[in-house]
């Protein structure tokens, strides 16, 4: 099974989990240099990379694409939100005037132009993921982001990229993680069960992008094994 793990360049959660399977040929892809990691490729996965499809075409065609695009710009947790709403008809983005008005009420001021760079990066990566999946047409695909992320509205309403929302809590899979309600958007039902486990770890206490972007190994393995089960089931028909 050939797997492309997109944006797997910080915590490298997919690489760490998938290397345990001898029947998986995983290719982790991102923008951070990892010369010591086998089958890692440094590629800009955003739609700003005009050679994106050409560069990825050099790799074996994927059976599975799993991706964790940057989530910061889509977050509901932002004090000043980038997106007011995303519908099938329109996208409303917080403009400069409204941003500065809200900024006046905050104890820690935010930079409008820095925020726009973050927004454009997030949007370009979301576009890149969908372009990749639609071009290479893997049998299975999974995209991870916070459950409350606006990226799901962007996929469904702006890009007409439909899928199934599979919800998970990280502490159900590893008690060293915070709850971190997450969605794994996919073309299949992954059958993830939500537990009732209380976490002793608060999300606010998790520091550093690497730690915040980490995914429990057992959850990644469960997703992959579910996909493999479905793949084998297809062979029997």
Name every feature range the model reports, one short phrase each.
Residues 1-75:
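SAM cofactor-binding core of SAM-dependent methyltransferases
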């Amino acid at each position: 099974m050939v797997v492309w793990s997109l944006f797997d360049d910080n915590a490298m959660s997919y690489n760490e989990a998938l290397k345990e399977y001898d029947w998986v040929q995983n290719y982790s892809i991102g923008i951070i240099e990892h010369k010591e990691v086998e089958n890692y490729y440094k590629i800009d996965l955003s739609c700003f990379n005009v050679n994106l499809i050409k560069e990825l075409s050099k790799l074996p065609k994927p059976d599975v694409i799993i991706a964790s695009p940057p989530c910061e710009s889509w977050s509901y947790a932002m004090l000043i939100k980038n997106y007011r709403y995303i519908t099938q008809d329109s996208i409303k983005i917080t403009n400069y005037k409204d941003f500065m008005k809200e900024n006046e009420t905050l104890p820690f001021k935010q930079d409008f132009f820095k925020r726009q760079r973050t927004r454009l990066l997030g949007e370009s990566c979301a576009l890149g993921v969908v372009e990749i999946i639609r071009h290479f047409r893997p049998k299975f695909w999974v995209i991870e982001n916070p459950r409350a992320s606006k990226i799901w509205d962007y996929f469904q309403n702006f890009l007409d990229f439909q899928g199934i929302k599979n919800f998970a809590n990280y502490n159900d899979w590893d008690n060293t993680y915070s709850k971190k309600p997450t969605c794994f958007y996919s073309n299949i039902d992954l059958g993830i069960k939500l537990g009732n486990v209380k976490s002793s770890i608060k999300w606010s206490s998790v520091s550093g992008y690497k730690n915040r972007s980490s995914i429990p190994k057992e959850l990644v393995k469960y997703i992959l094994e579910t996909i493999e089960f479905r793949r084998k089931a297809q062979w029997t028909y």
